[in-house]
Amino acid sequence: MANKGPSYGMSREVQSKIEKKYDEELEERLVEWIVMQCGPDVGRPDRGRLGFQVWLKNGVILSKLVNSLYPDGSKPVKVPENPPSMVFKQMEQVAQFLKAAEDYGVTKTDMFQTVDLFEGKDLAAVQRTLMALGSLAVTKNDGHYRGDPNWFMKKAQEHKREFTESQLQEGKHVIGLQMGSNRGASQAGMTGYGRPRQIIS
């Protein structure tokens, strides 16, 4: 907030480490995706962390982003006609985005806190949330994602296998590799090593 002073000592070190996690290349990719997903009317931010924060701070662009991943008629977040100017309304808009992102499938561990964006505490966490949202959109592949699919990693998906009863029976007769092998080198034809012990009395 406006009345929060600069941090010193240990707090400054912690804040500095958090700020180093912010990725400017990732910022460019996320801006490209948001503009492609929401349309050019969302504009573009000034380069850098402060521009990125100011661009997303009121929650309207984030709300448009998550709404664009749903089919028409089932948009989860109500986007106001005019961007909210009151602080609590902006924070409420961001909170609605976070709720919609969680409903979409983003895990709690990938979510940022509202203050991370609003006060600029941890913009890397904001990037993480947007990356997780993009990855889910690419993975779902339901036709609502717009942009380059290579911008985000596809999440691993379950791949169930069905076996017939005869295949399961055959599997019981296979010696697992953990048991060792019954082929290859053996001790057949080997004689004892060395000479026998000579005991002379």
UniProtKB/Swiss-Prot annotation:
Answer whether the UniProt record assigns the keyword Acetylation to this protein. yes
Please tell me whether the keyword Mitochondrion is annotated for this protein.
no
- Give the sites modified to Phosphoserine: S166, S181
Supply the name of the protein: Transgelin
The UniProt record describes its induction as: By growth factors.
GO molecular function per UniProt: actin binding
Query: Function of this protein?
Result: Actin cross-linking/gelling protein.
| Major localization class | cytoplasm
Q: Where are the Calponin-like repeats?
A: 175-200
**Pfam families named among the record's database cross-references:** Calponin (PF00402), CH (PF00307)
Q: Which PROSITE patterns match?
A: CALPONIN_1 (PS01052), CALPONIN_2 (PS51122), CH (PS50021)
User: Could you tell me which residues carry N-acetylalanine?
Assistant: A2
**What species is given as this protein's source?**
Bos taurus (Bovine)
Q: Tell me the ranges covered by the Calponin-homology (CH) domain, including all copies.
A: 24-137
One GO cellular component assignment for this chain's record is: cytoplasm
Q: Which CDD domains match?
A: CH_TAGLN
Q: Where in the cell is it found?
A: Cytoplasm
Q: Which family does it belong to?
A: Belongs to the calponin family.
- Mark the residues carrying the PTM N6-acetyllysine: K172
Sorted alphabetically, the keyword list is:
Acetylation, Actin-binding, Cytoplasm, Methylation, Muscle protein, Phosphoprotein
